[in-house]
Design a protein with these regions (language model features):
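Transmembrane helix-loop-helix hairpins at the membrane interface
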Residues: 38-46, 145-271
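Short helix-terminus and kink motifs of transmembrane alpha helices
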Residues: 50-55, 128-129, 177, 181
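Juxtamembrane helix-loop-helix connectors linking adjacent transmembrane helices
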Residues: 21-23, 61-68, 90-167, 185-186, ...
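N-terminal, membrane-interfacial amphipathic/helix-forming hydrophobic leader that caps
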Residues: 2-108, 192, 248-271
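N-terminal start-of-chain detector that recognizes signal peptides
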Residues: 58-60, 69-73, 134-140, 173-174, ...
């Protein structure tokens, strides 16, 4: 089973997405542990994210120590999840190139990564600055989120940056590395793998609301297409991390408000 599953990737681009018969093919071709991971990513992960977001948004104020605890626990959770996914992927015979961890032309990949990261950083920062002066419901929701969850001190910014880097590495490995490799191994074509992995990525971000989930899914289409075209997750890892870093820094700057020292003293911690 180990070697056979890894070899399935060779003919993946020839697969057809043909309704019930194709779904039956997926069910029979994908190992049980991969299905378990897929169900976890599609059901448990979105539920966990929405519940945590609902909890924090219901609070009139979130203390600095609570934000740092949130950042740290999320970092730990993502690395643990990525480690489990990697364990099962390698146990089933998936290779580094199949997972997007090796291959492609380094010069092209580095150039694409640099140009993309620069454009993403500038565009995302400018968009958040533009939204700051708006009373649109999306801007109001972002403002409420920034006041509670975005970094408001140097210590928080360090932890948030580590969280952004973790999300870039772990989420891209899981959704663009493992998920796409698993779908290829089950016989999906490239376009089907792009769509399904992007739907899963969007659903995993339901805690951002319907609009945020849809936008994340659309972004996932771009990221998945780049991963397949260049046989590497490196560009999208960097782009994802840049998006999150800019969201935290620009969001805190244009939407957040500084937590009061008195509130943190009452919480027992002043950073």
């Amino acid at each position: 089973m180990r070697g056979a599953y890894g070899a399935c990737v060779v003919g993946a681009s020839c697969a057809l997405f043909t309704g019930r018969g194709y779904i039956n093919q997926m069910i029979s071709a994908m190992p049980w542990d991969f299905w378990f991971i897929f169900l976890f990513l599609s059901i448990v992960l979105p539920w966990r994210g929405r519940e945590r977001m609902r909890h924090f948004m219901a609070q009139p104020q979130v203390l600095r120590r609570e934000r740092i605890r949130l950042y740290a626990s999320t970092i730990l959770f993502q690395w643990m999840l990525a480690a489990i996914v990697a364990w099962r992927a390698f146990a089933r015979g998936l290779t580094l190139p199949q997972l997007g961890l090796a291959g492609g032309r380094p010069s092209s990949i580095f150039l694409l990564t640099f140009i993309g990261a620069t454009l993403i950083a500038v565009a995302h920062w400018m968009n958040l600055r533009r939204m700051a002066g708006s009373n649109h419901p999306a801007a109001q929701k972002l403002r409420a989120m920034a006041e509670r969850l975005f970094p408001q001190s140097l210590t928080e910014t360090i932890f948030f940056t580590l969280l952004a880097l973790t999300a870039g590495i772990c989420e891209e490995f899981i959704f663009r590395g493992f998920v796409i490799a698993a779908l290829f191994g089950a016989g999906l074509s490239s376009w089907a793998a792009v769509i399904i992995s992007s739907l899963m990525f969007g659903v995993a971000h339901l805690y951002q609301g319907k609009g945020g989930s849809v936008g994340t899914g659309i972004l996932g289409v771009l990221f998945a297409s780049i991963r397949i075209a260049y046989h590497s997750i490196f560009p999208v890892v960097v782009w994802h991390a840049v998006l999150d870093v800019v969201a935290g820094l620009a969001g805190a700057r244009y939407f957040g408000k500084q937590a009061t020292p008195e509130a943190d003293r009452r919480g027992g911690l002043l950073l």
